[in-house]
Amino acid sequence: MSYFNNFPITLYDVDGSGNSKLVTNILKRVRVRANMAKEYSLLDPYDIQDGETPEILADRHHGSPYYHWVIMLMNNVRDPQHDWPKSTRQMQMYLQGKYGSAENQNAVHHYEAPQSSGDTTIRMEVLSNYPGAIEISNYTYEHNVNEEKRSIDLLRNDFLGPFVSEFEREILR
């Protein structure tokens, strides 16, 4: 099933001339029920591999690239250009475009230090003069942001049919 196949059709005056055309209402949204997103028996944790796209992953996991939208919806991926992890090559190009030279990529982005109480594995952003502050470069910062996007949940195939059916019902509401 293609993502937009079941979206409602509406009349829209594209150019303001008074001549309306039938168009797919791409502004319609459906959100995954909170209790479903938290129901771990429905989901399998997965780490996205370098270069995997939602379509590749959907083909491998659900048997069709057309279910890429299920993966994106279940993981709140609205824009795959920004919400999906970049491949190694894409990351190199992104860093080059954003920071330019290797020197700028290795410049200080911010400083971090472990929390002093509670879970000390969690780091907090601090000023450079904070005791124990560690430099985090632009490269390291961007790499860490990208890596955090790799952990997702995949809907188990037993629940794919009911999920798609519910989506089709809800999108027409």
Each language-model region and where it sits:
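Cell-surface/extracellular proteins and modules involved
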Residues: 1-173
